[in-house]
């Protein structure tokens, strides 16, 4: 019985770590724009993302092309 409980706990722990490494793939369609500025001093234009989730998803999926939130609202 103790072994079965231990096994279940190990599986749940592994599943938690695997799920934590996944990038958000589906964001809500609510338009709450955020302006992002390129991370790491890259010289490219600021970019408007549809919402914070979209910015986070972009950063997770594009490790070499990340943006920091500059402010709420569209980039000017």
UniProtKB/Swiss-Prot annotation:
PROSITE patterns: KAZAL_2 (PS51465). It comes from Hybomitra bimaculata (Horse fly). Vasodilator protein that inhibits vasoconstriction of isolated rat femoral artery induced by phenylephrine. Since platelet aggregation and vasoconstriction are key hemostatic responses, particularly in small wounds, this protein likely participates in the antihemostatic responses during blood feeding. Blocks L-type calcium channels (Cav1/CACNA1) in left ventricular myocytes isolated from rat hearts. One of its GO terms (molecular function) is voltage-gated calcium channel activity. The keyword Nuclease does not apply. The keyword Secreted applies. Pfam families: Kazal_1. Keywords: Calcium channel impairing toxin, Disulfide bond, Ion channel impairing toxin, Secreted, Signal, Toxin, Vasoactive, Vasodilator, Voltage-gated calcium channel impairing toxin. One of its GO terms (cellular component) is extracellular region. It is found in: Secreted. Expressed by the salivary gland. This is Vasotab. Disulfide bonds join 23-60, 27-53, 35-75. InterPro entries: Kazal_dom, Kazal_dom_sf. Residues 21-76 form the Kazal-like domain. It comes from the Eukaryota. Coiled coil: none annotated. One of its GO terms (biological process) is negative regulation of smooth muscle contraction. Residues 1-20 form the signal peptide.
